[in-house]
Amino acid sequence: MPSSMVINTNIASLNSQKFLSRTNDSLHASMERLSSGLRVNSAKDDAAGLAIADRMTSQIRGMTVAMRNANDGISMAQTAEAGMGTVTETLQRMRDLAVQAANFAAVSGSDRDKLNAEFKQLGLELGRIIRNTEFNGKKILNGSLVGANFQVGPNTASDNQISVTVSDLAKVQSLSALFGTKLSIGGGTNSVSVRLAISAIDTAIGKVDIFRSNLGAIQNRFVTTIANLQSSVENQSAARSRIIDADFAAETANLSRSQILQQAGTAMLAQANQANQGVLRLLQ
């Protein structure tokens, strides 16, 4: 049945307006995505995708902060190990003095007193190092660092933390004997006393080496944790990108298509609006 010629309702114009509105929406969406670089700019673009991407963002940012925390752990362990390294160097110097003092055949009592003066000062310095070595205001060699938890994951689970304890060097008996010092290599001592000093120093060096090994193991654990976090951040970022980032090739094609449809729709709307002009000719 042929269409009637009416003037109150222009169906062709209404259809053209409807499709032109859709084209404009698509054009604006493509322009927004290309300008922002995001496929999902608001919940209306992809509500489920936005929710998933937000959860991934929380995990990615949490893991990024966790990497910084793990690096803090490495820095703390390095500081503690450096302090222990100084302790070891001091002990080695004290051992040199004791071995020299043990040479009773060539070293006089007054010479041993001079050696002992340095020996005692070094013993006092050992105590000062242990009492005052700190990281970010926290003492780390005097037993204060017990069960220090480093947050190395994005969540609250206990396995997202690494607990670090640094032994109290002051409680190591052989070290304590050197503070002040209870051992002596001076002129009033005999060879037995000097040998005891050497033995105590050797024991102390061995124990400090054990503590340093433990700190090295802690550092390696932090390094492994950081490597795992880096891989997780990379993979989660890639997954998030697939959900939320714009595909520039596809969006450029959509933009071109929408621009052509907009031009065509505008032309067709103009023609549809002119169609009713034929009614005027009938009335002439």
Question: Where would I find each of the regions flagged by the language model?
Answer:
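Primary detection of the long, small/polar-rich alpha-helical "axial" segments characteristic
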Residues: 1-284
